């Protein structure tokens, strides 16, 4: 069986702290997988890393056969890798355009509309 999502040695470091330390994960296509652990264990950081909201320090992630390491969050969403959030918020490290694209339905039409909107408000 092929895997829809795989990570190999995925590491996220904040300062000197490894929030995720060389995580290997394989999710078979068509299967559900739960990620459980105590507060502060790195579950949300891991999800943020594979969806592109925090940069990885090492390792790689492959979704549906393609390396997603260089993709922006909205590009990962367009490929089908999406998530829900614990709270509604803007992402301070993303531009206004990228924040809008994260929320947009994954089509070129919405990218076009977001570009038009941002040009109208001069952002």
Task: Tell where the protein language model's regions lie, with residue ranges.
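Helix-to-loop junction immediately C-terminal to a conserved catalytic motif
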Residues: 51
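Short coil-to-beta microelement around the adenine-binding A-loop and adjacent beta1/P-loop entry
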Residues: 17-18, 75
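The feature captures the beta-strand-to-loop junction immediately N-terminal to the Walker
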Residues: 36-38
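Short coil-to-helix segment of the ABC ATPase nucleotide-binding domain corresponding to the Q-loop/switch region
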Residues: 94-116
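Conserved ABC transporter NBD signature motif
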Residues: 59-67, 79
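Conserved small/polar residues in nucleotide/adenosyl-binding loops
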Residues: 121-123
């Amino acid at each position: 069986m092929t895997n829809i999502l795989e990570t190999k040695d995925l590491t996220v470091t904040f300062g000197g702290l490894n929030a995720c330390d060389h995580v290997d994960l394989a999710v078979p296509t068509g299967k559900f997988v739960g990620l459980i652990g105590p507060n502060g264990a790195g579950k949300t950081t891991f999800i943020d890393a594979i969806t592109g909201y925090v940069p990885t320090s090492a390792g790689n992630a492959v979704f549906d056969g393609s390396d997603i390491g260089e993709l922006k969050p909205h590009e990962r969403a367009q490929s089908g890798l999406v998530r829900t959030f614990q709270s509604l918020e803007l992402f301070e490290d993303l531009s206004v355009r990228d924040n809008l694209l994260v929320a947009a339905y994954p089509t070129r039409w919405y990218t076009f509309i977001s570009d038009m909107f941002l040009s109208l408000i001069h952002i």
